[in-house]
Amino acid sequence: MADNTYQPAKVWTWDKSGGGAFANINRPVSGPTHDKTLPVGKHPLQLYSLGTPNGQKVTIMLEELLALGVTGAEYDAWLIRIGEGDQFSSGFVDINPNSKIPALRDNSHNPPIRIFESGAILVYLADKFGHFLPQDLAKRTETLNWLFWLQGAAPFLGGGFGHFYHYAPVKIEYAINRFTMEAKRLLDVLDKQLAHHPYVAGEEYTIADMAIWPWFGNVVLGNVYDAAEFLDAGSYQNVQRWAKQVAERPAVKRGRIVNRTNGPLNEQLHERHDASDFENHTEDKRQS
């Protein structure tokens, strides 16, 4: 159950070989490791990302805006391969000093506006284009309640449960039990909310749904961590209903494959520069 021989040192030191699946990119300091200018495409919105749950939040939002006919939401999505350290380039760190995807630059302003942290990007795009974040104070506040709930919950589901259950080089019973308990508690919170509402924040589909679905929707649908059975995901019937409903939205189907580098080749679009890329440049087409 536990390695009782381990005793923490008085002062921690970095063991570069001890980070498991992410040992080559995890480090205790910030800042760039190399100089590299980021590519820039033809649209004002330049997204630098990877198709993880956090990355999917933003590409789903952008595709939803485009589905409404918001032409100003056209964007270039550039792939940041975090396993190769792209997030530590000088160009990326200029946008996000925290070296985490996604990062967005809006070149329609002079000087350009940088936006980092996925929740901040969702709010920025909602405010900029006037969609998916209600103007009514009570509804806006409820949407933000759930957006920030997700921002606090995701590290427990991903960095906690997902890491120790799926990625960690050794299975630690205490850690898996600790974070499974929290993951299931969070699923129960969400299930009870969705028992009374079609969408997370009420009657409307909002940025709260776009933020929460890539994490909790993907988990209960078995798309990440291979943990749906372990978590007894089928017992959360309201989350299941909502997750399947959101998954069927055309913009979600598009957004979830942008900058994706795993899974079926027809669900990987490494870069996105216009709508035709979904038909012409998925990896199954590129490799044929």
Task: State the predicted function of each range.
Residues D94, E248, I257-V258:
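Phosphate-coordinating loops and pocket residues in cytosolic domains that bind phosphorylated ligands
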Residues M1-N177, M181-K184, H281-S288:
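GST-like domain detector, emphasizing the conserved glutathione-binding G-site
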Residues A2-D3, P134, A138, N145-P250:
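GST-like fold's C-terminal all-alpha helical module
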Residues R81, I207, N259:
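Short, solvent-exposed turn/loop segments enriched in Gly/Ser/Thr/Pro and often Arg
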Residues A21-A23, R260-S288:
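Acidic/histidine-enriched, glycine/proline-rich intrinsically disordered or flexible terminal extensions
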Residues K253-R254:
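C-terminal anion-handling pockets and recognition modules
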